[in-house]
């Protein structure tokens, strides 16, 4: 219950950061009640997730792992907005690991927080890192596929959010073209009247980036 509360708090805050109006087909908290309420709700859910652990004596030893996960998640989310250039594949993997792995690994790693330096723990950590990247790649492919179905640029491209397919496409661009993916100083999306958006969406669809990403997921 504690981890699920933390997970949902991260989704509420994520929608605020990304200006998303819906979550899983349902109007997001920030869209329905405003950004301020959404931030406060997310904060309250994080506090409640810690409170649940502190009230159960059998789980109090997991509080350190729980709080470390919160710190890592916050740093990972902030890292997404701290660069003006679109992430390379290596940077993409690092971003995903920072904002996804701590949450996915928490239920198991929190069971034995004193044994994090063992060989077995490192193997478990690598497993969760790989799982996090695979999970995010699935979401990214779905985002591109949704754009194709709607015959419109995918939201991840429009908002210049890290996406596995776009990162692979970006890696293959000449340095001069990569500059066209440079974000504004606010780290935000393409302007609504920016003609590059449709152009680059067409180029992504014409490339083999989506096929390469699907193969990566299969591997």
For each feature predicted by the language model, list its residue ranges:
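All-alpha prenyltransferase/terpene-synthase fold signal
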Residues: 1-219
């Amino acid at each position: 219950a504690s981890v699920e509360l933390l997970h949902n708090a991260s989704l509420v805050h994520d929608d605020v950061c990304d200006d998303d109006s819906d979550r899983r087909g349902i109007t997001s908290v920030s869209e329905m009640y405003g950004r301020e309420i959404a931030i406060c709700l997310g904060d309250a859910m994080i506090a409640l997730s810690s409170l649940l652990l502190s009230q159960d004596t059998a789980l109090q030893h997991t509080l350190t792992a729980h709080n470390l996960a919160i710190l890592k998640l916050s740093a990972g989310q902030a890292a997404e907005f701290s660069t003006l250039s679109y992430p390379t594949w290596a940077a993409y993997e690092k971003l995903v690991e920072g904002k996804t792995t701590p949450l996915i690994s928490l239920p198991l790693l929190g069971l034995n927080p004193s044994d994090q330096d063992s060989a077995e723990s490192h193997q478990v950590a690598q497993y969760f890192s790989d799982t996090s990247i695979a999970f995010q790649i699935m979401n990214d492919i779905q985002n591109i596929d949704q754009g194709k179905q709607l015959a419109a640029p995918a939201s991840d491209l429009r908002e210049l959010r890290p996406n596995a397919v776009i990162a692979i496409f970006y890696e293959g661009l000449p340095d001069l073209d990569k500059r066209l993916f440079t974000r504004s100083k606010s780290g935000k999306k393409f302007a609504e009247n920016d003609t590059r958006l449709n152009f680059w969406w067409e180029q992504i669809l014409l490339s083999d980036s989506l096929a390469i990403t699907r193969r990566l997921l299969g591997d």
